[in-house]
């Protein structure tokens, strides 16, 4: 287990007590075509200036349900890159934030802390190029977060929340 960022605890109960966001109550009008997600890491990579220069930073990007890039941020710490994206999202006005599904894509594995930050920001879909931890999967299940790992141009693994995805065609 990894720590959850809440006083060093690995408890989902503590996150549940702190979380006021209900991801299932956030309205969305359409399903995301799962094959449209496959190109998102490449699109994110095209905007990674620091990674191009150093090869040593992580990135996090926010896409809307039309797969349009909203933000991409880089940092040496994967959690910091996520913080930058969620911070930028939270500065937007409420109507813009409520326009539909948002997809957070990370260039790393998916830890519980990243799931926690995604849930707290009200983002419904989290996808990473690496694997999610066991605790990340359990948290995604508890909070109805669509969790996708090993996202690449050939496919992905959906660990939870496939009802937000259209797998036809």
Predicted regions and their residues:
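Conserved active-site and cofactor/substrate-binding residues in soluble primary-metabolism enzymes
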Residues: 2, 7-10, 32-35, 39, ...
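Intrinsically disordered, low-complexity regions enriched in acidic/Ser/Thr/Pro/Gln residues
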Residues: 1-60, 64-65, 69-71
């Amino acid at each position: 287990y990894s720590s959850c960022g809440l006083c060093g605890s690995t408890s989902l109960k503590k996150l549940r007590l702190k979380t006021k966001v209900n991801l299932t109550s956030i309205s969305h009008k359409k399903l995301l075509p799962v094959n449209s997600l496959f190109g998102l890491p490449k699109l994110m990579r095209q905007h990674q200036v620091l990674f191009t220069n150093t090869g040593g930073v992580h990135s996090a990007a926010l896409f809307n349900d039309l797969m349009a890039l909203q933000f991409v941020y880089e940092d040496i710490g994967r959690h910091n890159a996520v913080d930058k994206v969620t911070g930028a999202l939270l500065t937007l006005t409420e109507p813009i934030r409520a326009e539909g599904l948002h997809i957070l894509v990370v260039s790393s594995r998916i830890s519980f802390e990243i799931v926690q930050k995604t849930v707290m920001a009200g983002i419904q879909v989290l996808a990473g190029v690496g694997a999610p931890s066991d605790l990340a999967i359990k948290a995604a299940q508890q909070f109805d977060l669509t969790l996708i790992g090993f996202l690449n141009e050939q496919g992905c693994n959906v660990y939870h929340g496939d009802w937000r995805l259209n797998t036809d065609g």
